[in-house]
Amino acid sequence: MRYRGIFLNDEDWGLTPWASQTFEPERGNIGPRTYAKVCELLLRLKANYLAPAMHPVSTSFNQIPETKLVADTFAIVMGSTHCEPLLLNTASEWDTKTMGPWNYDKNKEGINRVLTQRVRENSPYENVYTLALRGLHDGAMSTTLPMHEKVRMLQQALLDQRRILAENIDRPVETVPQAFTPYKEVLEIYSNGLELPDDITIVWPDDNYGYMKRLSGVREQRRTGRSGVYYHVSYLGVPHSYLWFSTTPPSLMYEELRKAYDTTAD
C-alpha cells in the first residue's frame, strides 16, 4: 500500500487542549513539537501520510512554517481532507472579508488565486494534493443549482485545480499524486456523470459508521490512479456522533477494508 495514514479531525476536545496546556503551552496550540510526535507515531505504525488538524480551534498546519519542515524531516507525505482543495484549510484560512465569498460561481478567480499561492508555497515538499470543491468546513457548497449544473461546476473546479498543479509543479501533472474523495453530497455528484482524469486516486468513503458506501466497479478498477479509503473510527456529526468509545469492531474494519483492498484500494 503506497500511502497509509490518518486525518486529525475533531481535535477540539483532545489534541488541542493537551498540546496547548501540557506540551506546547508557550504556543497555546498544536504546533511543530506536537506534529513531531504525531509523525513519529506514524512511522512506528508503518504509516507515511498525514492530513493535519483543520478545525478553527487549532492553528492551521500551513500557517506555521516549521511544521512543513517537521513532516519533511520524518519523510511524512502531507495531504488534506476531502473538503480542503490543494492543501488549503478552508475552515480557518479562508477570510471572506479579504478573499471574497467561498463560492465558485461568484468568486472563481479569487479562489484559484489563493489555491495557486498554496501550491507554490508547498511544492518543494512531498504532498498528495486533494482535488475538491465543497462548502467551508465540511459542508455542501451553498447553491440552488440543479444536479447537472453542480456536475458542471465541480468538473470545472477540478480542471482548474489540475491546471494550477501543472503550471506550478515542474513535472507532468499526471505524475503528481492527486486524490478525490466523493464524500457526502459529492458522491451523488460523482454518480451523476462527473469525469475524472485516469491518474487521480478515488478515495471511497464509508458511511461514517464503518460501512463502505461504494467500491470501485469494473471500469474504475482499470484506472491507473487506483483507489483508496476514507474510513472513520470516530465521528462528529449528524445523525449521531461517537468520539470517546471504540465502537467499530476490528472484525468489521477488516471485512470492509478487505473488500476495498480487493477492488484496487491499494
Predicted feature residues:
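Short helix/loop capping segments that flank catalytic or ligand/cofactor-binding pockets
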Residues: 15-18, 61, 88-89, 140-141, ...
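An acidic-aromatic substrate-binding cleft motif
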Residues: 1-27, 33-53, 225-228
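Catalytic domains of carbohydrate-active enzymes, especially glycoside hydrolases
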Residues: 27-56, 63-66, 70-81, 124, ...
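Glycine-rich, aromatic-flanked loop segments that form ligand/cofactor-binding clefts
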Residues: 1-15, 72-90, 201-205, 209-210, ...
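Short, glycine/acidic-rich beta->alpha junctions
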Residues: 30-34, 58-63, 182-186, 247-253
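Gly/Pro-rich turn-and-neighbor structural signature
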Residues: 55, 62, 70-73, 97-224, ...
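Structured mid-domain segments that build the active-site/substrate or prosthetic-cofactor binding neighborhood
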Residues: 43, 48-52, 58, 66, ...
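Glycine- and acidic
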Residues: 15-25, 47-53, 97-101, 136-148, ...
